[in-house]
Swiss-Prot record:
InterPro entries: ATPase_NBD, Chaperone_DnaK, Heat_shock_70_CS, HSP70_C_sf, HSP70_peptide-bd_sf, Hsp_70_fam. Acts as a chaperone. It comes from the Bacteria. It comes from Nitrosococcus oceani (strain ATCC 19707 / BCRC 17464 / JCM 30415 / NCIMB 11848 / C-107). This is Chaperone protein DnaK. The gene is dnaK.
Length: 640
C-alpha cells in the first residue's frame, strides 16, 4: 500500500503533510513554501496556474483568477451567503442547471469541486516530488460545521484530482491530533478555536488515555461556514475604497483591476497590523480621470482595524457558547485553548478567545500547519504507521426526515459520535397509501423548510391499509467521513429503497467521471504547454546571446558567416511562433551550432591580440579583487 498523505484544503491557503517514521512532516512546494495559496487562474493562452503563480497575476487577470472557492463548495446558487459572495469577488458566480453555485472563467462554467481539484492536484504533486513515487490516497480536512453536501463535494474534488479519499476529517479534530499526539499528561479537555480564511469552527475535545490508547473524543462542535479572513479583508477594502471616494470622488468598486490591487494591499495591511500599531496603504496610479492619474494613500491604525471587524470577532463567541453547552461544560472546565487558522494571528482575535475561555491560548501550535499535520497523523493511523490512536468524531448537525405537518423528526442528534446507525419506525399519513416519500434533512430547526434538504426518495409498493398501520423502517447510517446513507423498508413486504446522500443537487457520477478525464487530459496538455514555453525561453535566450556576440565581433565577422547566422535566427523566430516542438528543437540546434563556431572565432581572435603587460596585470588584479568581493557576498547570503 502506497503512502497516504494529509491535505488541509483551505479557503485561502492549502498545506500537505505526511508521516516520516513516527513524526509528521509538512512538505514544501516547488516554490519552497510550506503553504500554497488556494488560487487557480486560467490564462488567455489556455494555461492553468495554481498557487503563488496564480495569485501573482491576479491583478492583471481578475475575472479569470478564482480564489475562496471553498466558500461555494456544496452550496446552492440561491443561498443568501452565495448572493453576498457575488458582490465580493471579481469573477463570475453562476447558476448551474441543477441549481448549484458554479463559477465561470475564460467563458467556461466549472463546478467548485472541479476548481478545488486543481489545488489538490498541486498538493498531490508536491508530495510526489518529495517522495519520488506516485501518491494515490489522501485524508482531506473540512470545516467541522460543513454539511453533508459540502463533505460530498470535497470528496468529489479529491476524486477529480486523482486521489482516493480515505477519510474526510474535521479541521479542529485534526488540529487536536497535531497538538495532542506527543502529550502524555493524562486526561485533558481542549477547545480548538479555528478561524481560517473563509470558515469558523470551534470544537471541544477530550484527550484521554484509555487502555494504553491515546483517545481523541470530540464532545461537541459548532461554527459558521461563512466567516473568516476573507470577511476581514472585505471590511478593510470597503474602508479604503470609501476613504478614496471621499478624497477623489471616484468609487474604485466598479474597477476590477483596482479592486484586485486593493485586495492584495488590504491583506498585507491586515498582516502588518498584527505586529505594528499602524500601516500605510500606498497604491500609485490606482485609477485616472480627465485630470490625470490618481494615487491612493490611506493610513490605517490597529485600533481602526479592530473597530472595523469588531462584530465579526464577536460572531465567533456565539458558537463557542453553544459548543460548551452541548458538551455540558463551562469555560473553567477547559484545560487548554488551541488557536488554528491564519486569522487567529490577529491580537484582537486572541484577546477574544482568551476573554471567553478565561485562559491564555497556547502559542506552540502553528496555526497554518496544524490541520495538515493532523490529517497526516490520521493518514498514518489508516496506513498502520501510527498505533494506539483512536479518533472519535461527531456529526455537526442533526439529521432527520420530514413528517406530517412539515415537521423535522430527528433520527440522529447533532454531536453524535460517528460512525453511527439509527433506525426508527414510521407509518402512512393516509388510508390506502401505497408509497411514501422520504425527505432527508439536516439542521436544527423544528420546521422542515428551515433546514438543509439533503435529498429525497420514494418507497413504493406498500400494500393498501388504514393509515398508521404499515410499518416503514427508516435507517440512517453515517460513515466515518460524516457522509450519510439512508434506507427505508416496508416491514410487511420486505421491500427496501436506499440512497447515498449526494444532496438534492451535487455532481452526478457522469459529471465526476468527465471531470476526472478532463483533469487527466489537462495534465498531458499542461506538460506539453510547459515544454513549449521552456523551449521558447531557451530560444529567446540563445537569440539574445548570439546577437550580442555578433555586435561585439562587428566587422571581424565575415559577411557570409553573418548572413548565415541571421538566416538561422530568422528561422528560429518563425519556428517559435508555431507549436511544433520538434521544429523548434531543430532550429535551436542549428543556431547553437552556428553560434558555437562564431564563439570559437571570437575566442581565437582575442587570444591572438597582444595586450600591454601593465594593463593586463592591472586588469587581472582588479578582476581578482572583484571576484573576491562577489564571493564573500555570496557566502554571506548563504549563511543568512
Amino acid at each position: 500500500m502506497g503512502k497516504i498523505i494529509g491535505i488541509d484544503l483551505g479557503t485561502t491557503n492549502s498545506c500537505v503533510a505526511l508521516m516520516e517514521g513516527n513524526k509528521p512532516r509538512v512538505i514544501e512546494n516547488a516554490e519552497g513554501d510550506r503553504t500554497t495559496p488556494s488560487v487557480v487562474a486560467f490564462t488567455k493562452e489556455g494555461e492553468t496556474l495554481v498557487g503563488q503563480s496564480a495569485k501573482r497575476q491576479a491583478i492583471t487577470n481578475p475575472q479569470n483568477t478564482l480564489y475562496a472557492i471553498k466558500r461555494l463548495i456544496g452550496r446552492r446558487f440561491d443561498e443568501e451567503v452565495v448572493q453576498r459572495d457575488i458582490k465580493m469577488v471579481p469573477y463570475k458566480i453562476v447558476k448551474a442547471d441543477n441549481g448549484d453555485a458554479w463559477v465561470e472563467a475564460t467563458g467556461k462554467k466549472m463546478a467548485p469541486p472541479e476548481v478545488s481539484a486543481n489545488v489538490l492536484r498541486k498538493m498531490k504533486k508536491t508530495a510526489e516530488d518529495y517522495l519520488g513515487e506516485e501518491v494515490e490516497a489522501a485524508v482531506i480536512t473540512v470545516p467541522a460545521y460543513f454539511n453533508d453536501s459540502q463533505r460530498q463535494a470535497t470528496k468529489d474534488a479529491g476524486r477529480i484530482a486523482g486521489l482516493e479519499v480515505k477519510r474526510i476529517i474535521n479541521e479542529p479534530t485534526a488540529a487536536a491530533l497535531a497538538y495532542g499526539l506527543d502529550k502524555k499528561r493524562g486526561d485533558q479537555k481542549i477547545a480548538v478555536y479555528d478561524l481560517g480564511g473563509g470558515t469558523f469552527d470551534v470544537s471541544i475535545i477530550e484527550i484521554a488515555e484509555v487502555e494504553g490508547e491515546h483517545q481523541f473524543e470530540v464532545l461537541s462542535t459548532n461554527g459558521d461556514t461563512f466567516l473568516g479572513g476573507e470577511d476581514f479583508d472585505k471590511r478593510i477594502i470597503d474602508y479604503i475604497a470609501e476613504e478614496f471616494k471621499k478624497e477623489q470622488s471616484i468609487d474604485l468598486r466598479g474597477d476590477p483591476l483596482a479592486m484586485q490591487r486593493l485586495k492584495d494591499a488590504a491583506e498585507k495591511a491586515k498582516i502588518e497590523l498584527s505586529s505594528s500599531q499602524q500601516t500605510e496603504v500606498n497604491l500609485p496610479y490606482v485609477t485616472a480621470d480627465a485630470s490625470g492619474p490618481k494615487h491612493l494613500n490611506v493610513r490605517i491604525t490597529r485600533a481602526k482595524l479592530e473597530s472595523l471587524v469588531e462584530d465579526l470577532i464577536n460572531r465567533t463567541i456565539g458558537p463557542c457558547k453553544t459548543a460548551l453547552q452541548d458538551a455540558k461544560l463551562s469555560a473553567s472546565d477547559i484545560d487548554e485553548v488551541i488557536l488554528v487558522g491564519g486569522q487567529t494571528r490577529m491580537p484582537k482575535v486572541q484577546e477574544a478567545a482568551k476573554e471567553f475561555f478565561g485562559k491564555e491560548p497556547r502559542k506552540d501550535v502553528n496555526p497554518d500547519e496544524a490541520v495538515a499535520v493532523g490529517a497526516a497523523i490520521q493518514a498514518g493511523v489508516l496506513g498502520g504507521e501510527v498505533k494506539e490512536v483512536l479518533l472519535l468524531d461527531v456529526t455537526p448537525l442533526s439529521l432527520g426526515i420530514e413528517t406530517l405537518g412539515g415537521v423535522m423528526t430527528k433520527l440522529i442528534e447533532k454531536n453524535t459520535t460517528i460512525p453511527t446507525r439509527k433506525t426508527q419506525v414510521f407509518s402512512t399519513a393516509e388510508d390506502n397509501q401505497t408509497a411514501v416519500t422520504v425527505h432527508v434533512l439536516q439542521g436544527e430547526r423544528e420546521q422542515a423548510v428551515g433546514n438543509k434538504s439533503l435529498g429525497r426518495f420514494d418507497l413504493v409498493g406498500i400494500p393498501p391499509a388504514h393509515r398508521g398501520m404499515p410499518q416503514i423502517e427508516v435507517t440512517f447510517d453515517i460513515d466515518a467521513n460524516g457522509i450519510l446513507n439512508v434506507s427505508a423498508k416496508d416491514k410487511a413486504t420486505g421491500k427496501e429503497q436506499s440512497i447515498v446522500i449526494k444532496a438534492s443537487s451535487g455532481l452526478a457520477e457522469g459529471e465526476i467521471e468527465r471531470m476526472v478525464s478532463d483533469a487527466e487530459a489537462h495534465v498531458e496538455e499542461d506538460r506539453k504547454f510547459r515544454e513549449l514555453v521552456d523551449l521558447r525561453n531557451q530560444g529567446d535566450n540563445l537569440i539574445h546571446a548570439t546577437e550580442k556576440s555578433m555586435e561585439e565581433l562587428g566587422d571581424k565577422l565575415e559577411a557570409n558567416e553573418k548572413s548565415e547566422i541571421e538566416k538561422t535566427i530568422g528561422e528560429l523566430k518563425t519556428a517559435m511562433k508555431e507549436d511544433n516542438k520538434e521544429v523548434i528543437e531543430a532550429r535551436i540546434k542549428d543556431l547553437t551550432d552556428a553560434s558555437a563556431k562564431m564563439a570559437e572565432r571570437l575566442y581565437t581572435q582575442q587570444a591572438e591580440e597582444p595586450q600591454p603587460q601593465k594593463e593586463e596585470g592591472k586588469a587581472a588584479e582588479e578582476d581578482v579583487v572583484d571576484a573576491e568581493f562577489e564571493e564573500v557576498k555570496e557566502d554571506k547570503n548563504k549563511a543568512s
